[in-house]
Regions:
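A structural detector for beta-sheet-dominated domains
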Residues: 27-29, 58, 73-75, 130-134
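Structured domain cores in non-transmembrane regions
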Residues: 1-52, 56-57
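Activation corresponds to long, low-complexity, non-globular regions
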Residues: 78-140
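Ser/Thr- (and often Asn-) enriched beta-sheet segments in non-cytosolic proteins
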Residues: 21-25, 65, 71, 126-132
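An exposed acidic His-Trp-rich patch
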Residues: 44-94
């Protein structure tokens, strides 16, 4: 397990803005899958993550490499009724305390299936997720 909470070039955990990045390193073997999560901060309970299966880190025994953003989905956790992104009074940083929004149905679902009347950005306009295999000593 790895945590990515310290921006590249920073000395301590912090949020990032446009153009900044987080990095983390993991060790994996064929058959390993990756799952990551990151909250869509200007929401009640939305988060980014791959599908339930995770992202396969190897294909035909070789590590994958490159942009995997297309495998990251915006999900609704189902814990609070959604308010308009970036405006709702029960969203960080405007909420007075954690968990102040009205309870929802508790069902996690892809935001594309949620009929709340709001528009959400495409994942690729919010983040880019890339995989870069480490160089193995002695490998060509």
């Amino acid at each position: 397990m790895a945590v990515f909470n310290t921006p590249v070039g920073a000395k301590s955990p912090a949020p990032i803005g446009p153009g900044a990045a987080y990095e983390c390193s993991i060790e994996a073997a064929p058959g390993s899958k990756l799952t990551i999560t990151s909250m869509f901060g200007q929401s009640n309970d939305l988060f980014y993550a791959p599908n339930e299966s995770g992202i396969a880190l190897f294909k035909d025994g070789k590590p994958i490499s490159g942009d995997i953003t297309s495998q990251i989905i915006l999900w609704d956790a189902g814990t609070e009724v959604n308010q308009e992104p970036g405006i709702g009074s029960d969203q960080a940083p405007r909420q007075k305390a954690p968990n102040t929004g009205k309870d929802e149905n508790g069902v996690v679902q892809n935001i594309k299936k949620v009929k709340d009347g709001f528009k959400y950005p495409k994942t690729a306009s919010v983040m880019k997720v890339t995989i870069t295999p480490a160089k193995t000593p002695g490998a060509n």
